[in-house]
């Protein structure tokens, strides 16, 4: 059982109790009628304390008032517990009076009241002595009363209010409940002394309880702690050692939307109304009330366009006291009414009445807010509107009445209004959010992967998103200011998070996320858990040779959460097995060396299954539905975990049993590569050559291409006057005199002087030009030969390089074929995994394989029915995967056993088993690493020809003076053979006849074989020849049959054998081809000639040195701070001067320098 962070105590006898546990950190309630079966059950009923406060007294000095509610604290909580000190409080006005719980609609309280009289016991009335009252009140009326003797509750200890069924517990016993479930809105205890009262506010959490005979014996809170997450996700508190994937679904508080367009234009409806002139309109008969209205329009909310185009044939009459228009409340004309004016209400009508006073009087009579008058030179048939003019006739005109109020419900416009909505994609990164990406909704952890995806032109053809195998968005793209931005949608919680259980305890978490306090463990990160909380990072300590607990790769995770490295005990020594020779009359006498390649798989790829994530993905509805499936995921996971654990243990044992001591010790000396030339990979030995560093600094060097003879020339001209021997040191190359083409200044002066002197006296001194001409011809020869060799070498390099490239390409092809065969073996492991992932795209009879689409298209009940099919199908796929991995483990386990035998028998020694290490008699085996396995290269010798000899089982010896005895070959010595009438002994596997010696035989006491004598009744299946004719019976069955042995070369082995022999031969040919491509170039050399600087450069260096010394001396004299420099430079006369100058300052013990004041000398 898991060790939990909270102290889980056994709940006491009462099934209706509610006691605080875990250092008063939580409480567990359950009804008396709830008696589940034995085992773990996940349901509500647990409440965790989130806030604690205390109160000393609230009754004042006169005592508390019994039978009334005088004190209350406001809450909004699922449960509130009010507890007194351990000894409790007495039922008296000097200590405790009333405690209550307010569930908004009604109040439940417990009190006592033994007084009578006016104002006493206002809520309950007189209560009998030594009794308490438990009541419930609604709208000031008591609807529940329970009177209990104080013998049951001698003192007040606690009152707990719970929202579930509005339950109230007194001293841990259920005293009130109803069929309503409401949170606690207020509660309080009215008391004077005996406190303090502790208020504990709690929130409701699910709990996993372990019941025995209907009583909860153990409780694990589903509160987000590691223990709660693990137990409540797998519905059990008992876990064996292993790894358990989990998903921590946190509350998502943020949401964002990714829009297809950056902006959306919406054109709102524009209501058009066109006014027109009314023909045959009736004039008014007197007063404004008789003016008849036409074409009345009342605008609703929205946009309107009022067309008064017919007014172009009318003449507007401005306001002139009583005459014309009157619209002081309207600052617009009808011609401009569509210029974006806002109204809260608007009504427009046409009328025909007198221009004289018709508009003004209509506004005063509240028939309109504004009135516009227009003349069309009409007849004078309209009557007046004022009291003295009602019978008079005036000119009729068009009157436009506008009734309006200001506001923003109505707007007039000339054109339809276009509303532009700018969509800003504010994508929330690096935390769990709800998203709506191009219409697909879900939850995810969004990361920016633009830097990784920008170079691969993903979605470059206008695509918006890449979906994963389940149909959810995997990668989506958003057009940014500077180009496309790519984002990756990850699950909110790490899919690879796994709890680690070791020794029955939850000790850590394995995650693929590098969190604070984690430490690397293979390809994951490990977080240690102590007492239910995460602990800071600790390094891996100690080594162990074996691990009885849970292992991850080469690491052992112990029950205390610490990690140790598994270092298998190395094999100290090994010996070769003895020969086990069998008999054969055909003995081989000649052999061939054979190379056989064999691939054996020694490890399998482990898988980590997050069952809940695979089945439901990020769908919360699916996860709720999946809880009905019980421990099916636990069963699948247990199979996969056990396979992984066994795989790790056997793999460690495999390496520990085959790795000899000193295996990792490098050999760095006496390395022989045989005929393989790897000198290009080695650093050539350094040797001192060339001039010194000073010479390289003081001289200018010139390098040129030279011939092999240039080294001898350089040695010949070495020395201060070497340039004088230039022509004497000339060398011959292929019969031609050659000199390096570089001429120094000394040589140039020498040859020029010789040439000029030879021309001074004509033919007499002409012989002086011979040295000049000779050295010139030699240098031209050098240039010509060098250019010719360079051209030839270029042709050789090109031809050889082309040949080498061809061989390298062929080598790469051969290597790829060999690797392809290994890959075919390895890829068999992933076929079932590929099929499992492909199942995510199958709908298994549902309308879609995408869970989000199903819940969006159907209601809850229909969607659950469809998703139930997908859950069943995906669970079946996971079961197939688990079974396949289990079968693969058994096969790989057998392969490892075979590989262990191969290493011990073939690699570490010579096998005596024929054709076990390759084909034939074993000589040598070289192992090589391969993906998920080992390739063995077996060198064996196989028989080419045989000698047919007569084999003798043994000899029976009959001595003259003793009883007879028999001799047979000793085990492993061979067999007796007869050759030309003589007897020899020879090995069974190689024909080497030799004389028989005493060490080759074993003496038997008798020449006869021992048999057991029995009668006929013992062996009932034996028949005589008279009763049964074998020849006749066998002829019935064996006629027309062929007696041929099967062709074992075509036998279908279950062990995958990798044959790369032909590829190895091809690679060997390529190596030979590369060796043939070595280039034998004509040897050239680099000639380096040093040119001395001119005399004026040396003169400038000398002047600069002198100036530097003078400036340095001047600084010493002027500053008086020459110090030790005088002595260092050996300037003895200056030392006294420096001493006198520096003595002007005196340094005291406090390291403060003062200037000494010397007395002035009189002149």
Swiss-Prot record:
Residues 1025-1106 are annotated as: Heptad repeat 2 (HR2). The chain crosses the membrane at residues 1097-1117. Specific enzymatic cleavages in vivo yield mature proteins. The precursor is processed into S1 and S2 by host cell furin or furin-like protease to yield the mature S1 and S2 proteins. The cleavage site between S1 and S2 requires the optimal sequence [KR]-X-[KR]-R. Additionally, a second cleavage leads to the release of a fusion peptide after viral attachment to host cell receptor. The record marks 538-539, 691-692 as: Cleavage. GO terms for cellular component: host cell endoplasmic reticulum-Golgi intermediate compartment membrane; membrane; viral envelope; virion membrane. A motif (Di-lysine motif) lies at residues 1160-1163. Keywords: Cleavage on pair of basic residues, Coiled coil, Fusion of virus membrane with host endosomal membrane, Fusion of virus membrane with host membrane, Glycoprotein, Host membrane, Host-virus interaction, Membrane, Signal, Transmembrane, Transmembrane helix, Viral attachment to host cell, Viral envelope protein, Viral penetration into host cytoplasm, Virion, Virulence, Virus endocytosis by host, Virus entry into host cell. Residues 823-867, 1056-1084 form a coiled coil. Glycans are attached at residues 23, 51, 74, 102, 139, 145, 164, 179, 213, 238, 248, 265, 272, 277, 307, 426, 448, 514, 531, 543, 580, 592, 670, 677, 948, 961, 980, 1015, 1039, 1052, 1075. Residues 19-1096 are extracellular. GO terms for biological process: endocytosis involved in viral entry into host cell; fusion of virus membrane with host endosome membrane; fusion of virus membrane with host plasma membrane; receptor-mediated virion attachment to host cell. Homotrimer; each monomer consists of a S1 and a S2 subunit. The resulting peplomers protrude from the virus surface as spikes. The di-lysine motif confers endoplasmic reticulum localization for type I membrane proteins. This is Spike glycoprotein. It comes from Avian infectious bronchitis virus (strain 6/82) (IBV). The gene is S.
